[in-house]
Amino acid sequence: MSRLKKFYTEEIRKSLFEKFGYANKMQIPVLKKIVLSMGLAEAAKDKNLFQAHLEELTMISGQKPLVTKARNSIAGFKLREGQGIGAKVTLRGIRMYDFMDRFCNIVSPRIRDFRGFSNKGDGRGCYSVGLDDQQIFPEINLDRVKRTQGLNITWVTTAQTDDECTTLLELMGLRFKKAQ
């Protein structure tokens, strides 16, 4: 069992149950999945660069990414139907908890001028963060990076409100800005 999963079942569930006063234990929020995505429209013109970014996403997540393709052609953007324009990975289970542990303890402290993430969610129990640079991940070999590329991370939970979601993620180790 992952260190974070064990901590969730033994400690976090109890503190969430006490803080929010749920009627039963099935109402306690759970982290369902983590989705990592990259928009690679500029890299789509250069196949070697596109493959390099796919390899980086594979190293970051530990899974092979799904290439997202254009649904229709747009001549103004020189985009053809079926052309690869991005990549995404969905993490569940043990890989999800391992990624969350690495992100909170290793990656987020490496972000330059980091003072915490915004505590605004989507209102339905999901929380998203956009990173400007993939080089903050220790799995990435800095000598092989051809171009810096952003990365979007979305945490999907069973929480009903932003407060429940941010409290769950904060107890798991994600750092948020302090309310002033």
Swiss-Prot record:
A Pfam family per the record: Ribosomal_L5
Keyword tRNA-binding applies: yes
Record-level GO BP terms: translation
GO MF assignments: rRNA binding; structural constituent of ribosome; tRNA binding
Cellular component, GO annotation: ribonucleoprotein complex; ribosome
Keywords on record: Ribonucleoprotein, Ribosomal protein, RNA-binding, rRNA-binding, tRNA-binding
Domain of life from the UniProt record: Bacteria
Family: Belongs to the universal ribosomal protein uL5 family.
HAMAP family from the UniProt entry: Ribosomal_uL5_B
PANTHER family: 60S RIBOSOMAL PROTEIN L11-RELATED
Function of the protein: This is one of the proteins that bind and probably mediate the attachment of the 5S RNA into the large ribosomal subunit, where it forms part of the central protuberance. In the 70S ribosome it contacts protein S13 of the 30S subunit (bridge B1b), connecting the 2 subunits; this bridge is implicated in subunit movement. Contacts the P site tRNA; the 5S rRNA and some of its associated proteins might help stabilize positioning of ribosome-bound tRNAs.
NCBIfam families on file: PRK00010.1
Subunit structure: Part of the 50S ribosomal subunit; part of the 5S rRNA/L5/L18/L25 subcomplex. Contacts the 5S rRNA and the P site tRNA. Forms a bridge to the 30S subunit in the 70S ribosome.
Protein name: Large ribosomal subunit protein uL5
Organism annotation: Chlamydia pneumoniae
